[in-house]
Amino acid sequence: RVPIKGSERSAGEYPYYGANGIQDYVDDYIFDDELVLLAEDGGNFGSKIRPIAYRVSGKCWVNNHAHVLKPKSMIDVDYLCYSLMFYDTNGLVNGATRQKLTQATMRKMKIPKITLEEQLKIVEKLKKVQGVITKKRKQLEGLDILIKARFVEMFGDPVSNPFNYDKVRL
């Protein structure tokens, strides 16, 4: 885990990860593996919708704001990631303005110990659910575009006001 100042980064093809995902792309990498990154500081601690862990695969650079985890032999990387994404960090993080999950505290975190077969079944189900969520999000984005288009079709562009509607102050 090595930070690179924004002014010193050379643009490239390799993702540069921080606590909450890709921050940039750089021309070199320090990892080439299947890993889980867990926020160390500046993470979405306490969020029920934004994860504190995410999975990375292949060549990448990770800065010092994320813990880099490589699962042990009998732990599936996706299972580890799903287990940590919304982990309850109450009482584990410290810091008033920028919460931090220290390495010592991270090592105290526990996930359910189940067989690899059970892990893979859980991961399969969660990936199916994630697929449904992704599909529904795309549908919602399409509906949002439709609403905007219908508004303009029905009332015209609010800035140019082609139907000369009266205007009121908000």
Give short role names for the model-derived ranges:
Residues 1-18, 108-124, 135-170:
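Non-catalytic DNA-recognition/assembly elements of restriction-modification systems
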Residues 9-11, 30-31, 61, 101, ...:
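A generic fold-level signal
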Residues 18-85, 94, 102-106:
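A short beta-sheet element
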Residues 46, 99-102, 140-145:
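Juxtamembrane/interface motifs at transmembrane-helix termini
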Residues 76-77, 91-98, 116-122:
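Short, flexible active-site-proximal loops enriched in glycine and acidic residues
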